[in-house]
């Protein structure tokens, strides 16, 4: 009788400890995912703002219309930021057409363009952030931040977006799940 009672208490204590570890693991995953997201989106937004400041120097007004001058020099000034973040930086006009991009291979940004809804969110809120596929542009999840390209006269001439793959978060979460499943076994 005493053996059965000890065994029952031991089993109950083990299950409480195991449940606590799993619960703490899940809470850790939620906080880690939120931290990853906020950190990455913050860095992308900061660099998109910096790219917008740089871009403003390359825009002139001709007969009331804005034009980019020296696209190659502008793009080459964006590339160090893009490489440091492992991101794509691209400029879209207010119609959603992508005018410039740092993407290193075939550019889906120019093929699909930016959805009007995203452009409107930037114009209305001063910023746009998402973890998603940017409409049809990306095949997997990307962190994306967009900021308005506001000229010295206060006009919004376009939107600068910075996007980076969310694959690192996916791998991290997978590793955490593996660790939790090992604890469970």
What does each model-found stretch correspond to?
Residues 2-99, 103-106:
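Juxtamembrane segments flanking the first transmembrane helix
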Residues 76, 103-140:
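Extracytoplasmic/periplasmic sensor domains and loops in membrane signaling proteins
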Residues 82, 89, 143-146, 163:
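Amphipathic alpha-helical bundle/coiled-coil segments
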Residues 93, 136, 151:
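Acidic surface patches and DE-rich sequence motifs
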Residues 138-150:
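A short beta-strand signature within small-molecule sensing/ligand-binding domains used
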Residues 150-153, 161-180:
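Helix-start (N-cap) segments at beta->loop->alpha junctions
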Residues 156:
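Glycine-rich acetyl-CoA-binding "A-motif" of GNAT/NAT acetyltransferases
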Residues 183-185:
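Conserved small/polar residues in nucleotide/adenosyl-binding loops
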């Amino acid at each position: 009788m005493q053996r059965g009672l000890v065994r029952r208490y031991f089993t109950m204590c083990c299950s409480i400890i195991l449940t606590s570890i799993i619960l703490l693991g899940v809470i850790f995953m939620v906080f880690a995912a939120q931290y990853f997201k906020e950190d990455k989106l913050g860095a992308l937004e900061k660099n998109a703002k910096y790219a917008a400041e740089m871009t403003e120097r390359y825009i002139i007004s001709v007969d009331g219309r804005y034009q980019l001058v020296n696209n190659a020099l502008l793009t080459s000034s964006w590339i160090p930021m893009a490489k440091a973040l492992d991101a794509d930086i691209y400029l879209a006009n207010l119609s959603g057409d992508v005018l410039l991009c740092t993407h290193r291979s075939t550019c889906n940004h120019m093929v699909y363009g930016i959805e009007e809804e995203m452009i409107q969110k930037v114009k209305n809120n001063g910023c746009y952030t998402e973890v998603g596929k940017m409409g049809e542009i990306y095949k997997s999840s990307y962190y994306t931040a967009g900021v308005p390209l506001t000229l010295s006269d206060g006009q919004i001439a376009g939107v600068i977006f910075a996007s980076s793959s969310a694959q690192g978060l996916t791998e991290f979460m997978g590793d955490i799940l593996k660790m939790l499943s090992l604890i469970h076994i």
